[in-house]
Amino acid sequence: MTKRFPTPDYHFSYRIPPVSGNTINGLGETSPRRARQVFHGSGARKLEWVALEMFFGLTMPLHIFIRNALNRWELRKADGPLARKRTPVPDSAEMSKQIKSIAKQAGAGAVGITPMTEDALFEGQTADYQTAIVIALPQDYETMKAVTTVKAAAETVDTYRDVSRIVMALAAHIRSLGWRARAYGESADLLHIPLAINAGIGQLGKH
């Protein structure tokens, strides 16, 4: 009796065939398009690598997992109600100075303001705001030199939490003036790097 085997391209071990990173990143495509979310999705669409992200989360040490979960919980305050009365802004340059000052008082290391651009949006998203306020926060240099250690991982998660707290406080202040504002403490909703470059905070690394 002749044995019959499935062809090599038959995905007999997957309910959903895996998608490579090259495919997600558009390797070989000739037309420009927006980026697609890979990890830490906002929930706008099901991510191809969601199982790997879950594995990554479940394998981290418990105290780091808890810190990360707390950050996600705190980000529920990213948006909120507006003040009933809107404060006029006759001088946008002066207001920009005030916003930057408030952000630095809250702990930001650097602050920049830039228009929202197409390259900061993931595929399928729309711009809810015309302007982005971008902050940067330094990390402990000596700790991050050992980036693969648990201590460095804790420093990274703590920095995420610090950034979230700063931008949530800043957004709450803007809403208290009667203007819409939402805090984006993580990169699940927006691409932070293009905005940071446009805001004058830094430049794209070559690594």
Whereabouts are the PLM-identified features?
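Iron-sulfur (Fe-S) cluster-binding modules
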Residues: M1-I113, E123-D128
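Catalytic cores of enzyme domains
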Residues: A93, K100, K104-H207
